[in-house]
């Protein structure tokens, strides 16, 4: 049975990738359908109740800069905000919010239900319809067929998901939700490379059974950060603390004595887990010299008694989980509400994707989120946004868009996945970016909002506010560079009181601000440089741009050198077998990866600079290089 309407874009899955993937084409004016097995779990935080962190906060800001939802929802739901690495340089500072699960889900659902051009339908997708290697629609469990010009698949951990608690296991997409088995079989039939990954979650503890009085408190920042460029502190709900406890030798003994009942250590689980979020049994065995691990007790919400013990993800049997929990300080009498578990699921090799996240094999079919081998809400949201944008551009027969590595962390993420692939759940870190001084949280809107405006992703109110901010930044910089202080100035004594060394030659406001002891607030407290502007976002940009000008210019010069051939396109039908001078190994890798550009080809393991030169020569011979390349 066919549904009466035809859609431009269908998105399968209502998690963090799916919600962004559905909103993007709808904002672009395209008729979009979001298919989910349960509308009540839209935007569900399946694991830890937190958004952001090192690298991850950067992704949230980038999604927000392009009109995405995650930052807005985090502001509405955040019950503890912190700026991580606040004492370090601006490149690695990151925002993190502890979130109320219910408020977060409400914010997501409200945004989806009020988005023009977006329909939501509750039904499990069981098949993707394809004709002549081109997607044509989706069929569901009840036999209803939806026709569409493009499809974005964001199935999370649901594809052939299997939940493990001890040596018992059963099919499931997450606790309480069914796995998507039929769709997994269908995707395997398409000839895409598939493998298994694993992730896990800790048991949830009843707050009423925890002795918080003997535990250390962790409060949020006194000056609360805001995630969205359009948000404000007034969006935040009540702020509450987290608490800290530790594992101990008794905890570790309980774990070591029960490894024969662990699905990971008995070979029942074959999928590889996330390196940077290991289970407690992994931590105890891998770091045997440590007699304690820090555990954060994170509240799941303002109206919930559930507590998330961050740091004890486990798939050990329930009785062992009780032993682990009750062995820790403050948790001696704690009761588990939900057991921890591990989940294995299918993921598809992201090297079979274009950088737009469209599959190379099927036109109009896009993948985003954990199906591509990533871990984390933020990584999923960034991919969902990108896939949704390109699904919309595909429908309109417009040129695809994807960010470069020097343009955003989303660009780093996608390039890493599509070029190198992954054998373990991939997460973003600031260390993965070569040009991280340019990819800061604070300038995500400067980097990406103009592009979002061109693509039709943001409204005019947001665009006007962005332009006002840019005008303030430029006006203030011009003001500071036009006001000079010289050794004979009547204000010299006032300035020398705050300068590390006396002023001996004429200096502009920008020159003074470059001094390590000087800040914008100190500078604008001096009589010649009063008054300060009130917009703190603009102040931050002015200060960073001036203080780090030399470093920023150096990185931009490096980028320009690199870009000479970075974006040189390699045609999809380029025949490497006819390129003489390439080794068989290099030729095989290029045939396997089918890189879309010289830059992508250069990052494939084993592809030498000499091989790149040979390819460039052949592209030039065949007239495939543009003038100047």
Curated annotation (Swiss-Prot):
Record-listed NAD(+) binding positions: 273-287
Coiled-coil intervals: none
Molecular function per GO: flavin adenine dinucleotide binding
InterPro entries assigned: FAD/NAD-bd_sf (IPR036188), GIDA_C_N (IPR049312), MnmG (IPR004416), MnmG-rel (IPR002218), MnmG-rel_CS (IPR020595), MnmG_C (IPR026904), MnmG_C_subdom (IPR047001), MnmG_C_subdom_sf (IPR044920)
Main location: cytoplasm
A GO term from the CC aspect: cytosol
A biological process from GO: tRNA wobble uridine modification
Amino-acid positions noted as binding FAD in the UniProt annotation, renumbered to this chain: 13-18
Family, similarity comment: Belongs to the MnmG family.
Database matches in NCBIfam families: mnmG_gidA (TIGR00136)
Assembly description: Homodimer. Heterotetramer of two MnmE and two MnmG subunits.
Its job: NAD-binding protein involved in the addition of a carboxymethylaminomethyl (cmnm) group at the wobble position (U34) of certain tRNAs, forming tRNA-cmnm(5)s(2)U34.
Name of the featured protein: tRNA uridine 5-carboxymethylaminomethyl modification enzyme MnmG
Organism annotation: Haemophilus influenzae (strain 86-028NP)
């Amino acid at each position: 049975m066919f549904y009466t309407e035809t859609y431009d874009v269908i998105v399968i899955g209502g998690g963090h990738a799916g919600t962004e993937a559905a909103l993007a084409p709808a904002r672009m004016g395209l008729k979009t359908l979001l298919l989910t097995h349960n509308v009540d779990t839209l935007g569900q935080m399946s694991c830890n109740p937190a958004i952001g962190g090192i690298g991850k906060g950067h992704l949230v800001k980038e999604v927000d800069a392009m009109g995405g939802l995650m930052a807005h929802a985090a502001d509405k739901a955040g019950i503890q905000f912190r700026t991580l690495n606040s004492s370090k340089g601006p490149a690695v500072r990151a925002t993190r919010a502890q979130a109320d699960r219910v408020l977060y889900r409400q914010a997501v659902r409200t945004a989806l239900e009020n988005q023009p051009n977006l329909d939501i339908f509750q039904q499990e997708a069981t098949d993707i319809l394809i004709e002549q290697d081109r997607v044509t629609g989706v069929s569901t469990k009840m036999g209803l067929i939806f026709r569409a010009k493009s499809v974005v698949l964001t199935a999370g951990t649901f594809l052939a998901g299997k939940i493990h608690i001890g040596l018992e296991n059963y099919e499931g997409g997450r606790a309480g939700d069914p796995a998507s088995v039929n769709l997994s079989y269908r995707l395997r039939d398409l000839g895409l490379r598939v493998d298994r990954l694993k992730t896990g979650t800790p048991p949830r503890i009843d707050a009423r059974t925890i002795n918080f009085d003997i535990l250390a408190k962790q409060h949020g920042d006194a000056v609360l950060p805001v995630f969205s460029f359009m948000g404000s502190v007034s969006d935040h709900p009540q702020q509450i603390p987290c608490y800290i406890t530790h594992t101990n030798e008794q905890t570790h003994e309980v774990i070591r004595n029960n490894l024969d009942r662990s699905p990971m250590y008995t070979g029942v689980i074959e999928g590889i887990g996330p390196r940077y979020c290991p289970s407690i049994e992994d931590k105890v065995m891998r770091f045997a010299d440590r007699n304690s691990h820090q555990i954060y007790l994170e509240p799941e919400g303002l109206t919930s008694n559930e507590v998330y013990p961050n740091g004890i993800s486990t798939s050990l049997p329930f009785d062992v989980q009780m032993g682990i929990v009750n062995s820790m300080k403050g948790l001696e009498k704690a009761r588990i509400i939900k057991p921890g578990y591990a989940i294995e699921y299918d993921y598809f090799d992201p090297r079979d994707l274009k950088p737009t996240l469209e599959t190379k094999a099927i036109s109009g079919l896009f993948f985003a989120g954990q199906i591509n081998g990533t871990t984390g809400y933020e990584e999923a949201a960034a991919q969902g946004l990108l896939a949704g944008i390109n699904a919309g551009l595909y429908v309109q027969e417009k040129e695809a868009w994807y960010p470069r590595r020097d343009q955003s962390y989303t660009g780093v993420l996608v390039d890493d996945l599509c070029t190198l692939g992954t054998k373990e759940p991939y997460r973003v870190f600031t260390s993965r970016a070569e040009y991280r001084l340019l990819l800061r949280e604070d300038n995500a809107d400067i980097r990406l909002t103009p592009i979002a405006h061109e693509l039709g992703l943001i409204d005019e109110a947001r665009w006007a506010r962005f332009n006002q901010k840019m005008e303030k930044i430029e006006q203030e910089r011009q003001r500071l560079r036009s006001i000079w202080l010289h050794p004979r100035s009547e204000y010299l004594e006032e300035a020398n009181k705050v300068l590390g060394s006396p002023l001996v030659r004429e200096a502009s406001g920008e020159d003074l601000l470059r001094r390590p002891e000087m800040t914008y607030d100190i500078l604008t407290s001096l009589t010649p440089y009063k008054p300060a502007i009130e917009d703190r976002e603009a102040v931050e940009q002015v200060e960073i741009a001036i203080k780090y000008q030399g470093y920023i210019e150096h990185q931009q010069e490096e980028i320009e050198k690199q870009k000479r051939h970075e974006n040189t396109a390699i045609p999809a039908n380029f025949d490497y077998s006819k390129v003489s001078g390439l080794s068989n190994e290099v030729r095989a890798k290029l045939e396997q990866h089918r890189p879309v550009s010289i830059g992508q080809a250069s990052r494939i393991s084993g592809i030498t600079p000499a091989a790149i030169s040979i390819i460039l020569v052949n592209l030039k011979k065949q007239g495939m290089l543009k003038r100047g390349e």
